[in-house]
C-alpha cells in the first residue's frame, strides 16, 4: 500500500496517462484503493436513467479515480510539482512540508 501524502483540496498535476500535464483540485482521497478523484480529470461519460428524484436522465461526465502514483502535488509558491515530506515541529506536531520550497502545507 502506498503512503498517502496528498489530501483533499490539494492542487495536483497528472504526470502520466491520457491527461498528462493537466492540473486540478483533489475532490476525494480513496486511501484503501490508493486512488484520488481530481476535479475535471479522467472524465468518463456515464448514461444515467431518469428516476423519481431526478426527472432528467441522459449522459453525464463523471470524474473517475486516478492512482496516487500518477499525480504530483503542485507547490503554491513556485507553481511547480514537488514531493511532500513529513516533519515534526518543536511542539511535537507532525506537519507536511514541500521539499522544493520548504514551506509548511496546510
UniProtKB/Swiss-Prot annotation:
<dbReference type="InterPro" id="IPR003256">
    <property type="entry name" value="Ribosomal_uL24"/>
</dbReference>
<comment type="function">
    <text>One of two assembly initiator proteins, it binds directly to the 5'-end of the 23S rRNA, where it nucleates assembly of the 50S subunit.</text>
</comment>
<keyword id="KW-0694">RNA-binding</keyword>
<dbReference type="InterPro" id="IPR014722">
    <property type="entry name" value="Rib_uL2_dom2"/>
</dbReference>
<keyword id="KW-0687">Ribonucleoprotein</keyword>
<dbReference type="InterPro" id="IPR005824">
    <property type="entry name" value="KOW"/>
</dbReference>
<dbReference type="Pfam" id="PF00467">
    <property type="entry name" value="KOW"/>
</dbReference>
<comment type="similarity">
    <text>Belongs to the universal ribosomal protein uL24 family.</text>
</comment>
<protein>
    <recommendedName>
        <fullName>Large ribosomal subunit protein uL24</fullName>
    </recommendedName>
</protein>
<dbReference type="Pfam" id="PF17136">
    <property type="entry name" value="ribosomal_L24"/>
</dbReference>
<dbReference type="GO" id="GO:0006412">
    <property type="term" value="P:translation"/>
</dbReference>
<comment type="function">
    <text>One of the proteins that surrounds the polypeptide exit tunnel on the outside of the subunit.</text>
</comment>
<comment type="subunit">
    <text>Part of the 50S ribosomal subunit.</text>
</comment>
<keyword id="KW-0689">Ribosomal protein</keyword>
<dbReference type="InterPro" id="IPR008991">
    <property type="entry name" value="Translation_prot_SH3-like_sf"/>
</dbReference>
<dbReference type="GO" id="GO:0005840">
    <property type="term" value="C:ribosome"/>
</dbReference>
<keyword id="KW-0699">rRNA-binding</keyword>
<dbReference type="GO" id="GO:1990904">
    <property type="term" value="C:ribonucleoprotein complex"/>
</dbReference>
<dbReference type="InterPro" id="IPR041988">
    <property type="entry name" value="Ribosomal_uL24_KOW"/>
</dbReference>
<dbReference type="InterPro" id="IPR005825">
    <property type="entry name" value="Ribosomal_uL24_CS"/>
</dbReference>
<dbReference type="GO" id="GO:0019843">
    <property type="term" value="F:rRNA binding"/>
</dbReference>
<dbReference type="GO" id="GO:0003735">
    <property type="term" value="F:structural constituent of ribosome"/>
</dbReference>
Amino acid at each position: 500500500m502506498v503512503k498517502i501524502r496528498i489530501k483533499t483540496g490539494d492542487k495536483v498535476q497528472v504526470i502520466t496517462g491520457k491527461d498528462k500535464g493537466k492540473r486540478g483540485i483533489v475532490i476525494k482521497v480513496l486511501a484503501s484503493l490508493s486512488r484520488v478523484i481530481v476535479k475535471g480529470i479522467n472524465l468518463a461519460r456515464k448514461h444515467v436513467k431518469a428516476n423519481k428524484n431526478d426527472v432528467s436522465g441522459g449522459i453525464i461526465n463523471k470524474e473517475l479515480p486516478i492512482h496516487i502514483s500518477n499525480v504530483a502535488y503542485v507547490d503554491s509558491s513556485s507553481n511547480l510539482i514537488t514531493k511532500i515530506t513529513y516533519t515534526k515541529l518543536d511542539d511535537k506536531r507532525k506537519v507536511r512540508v514541500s521539499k522544493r520550497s520548504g514551506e509548511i502545507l496546510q
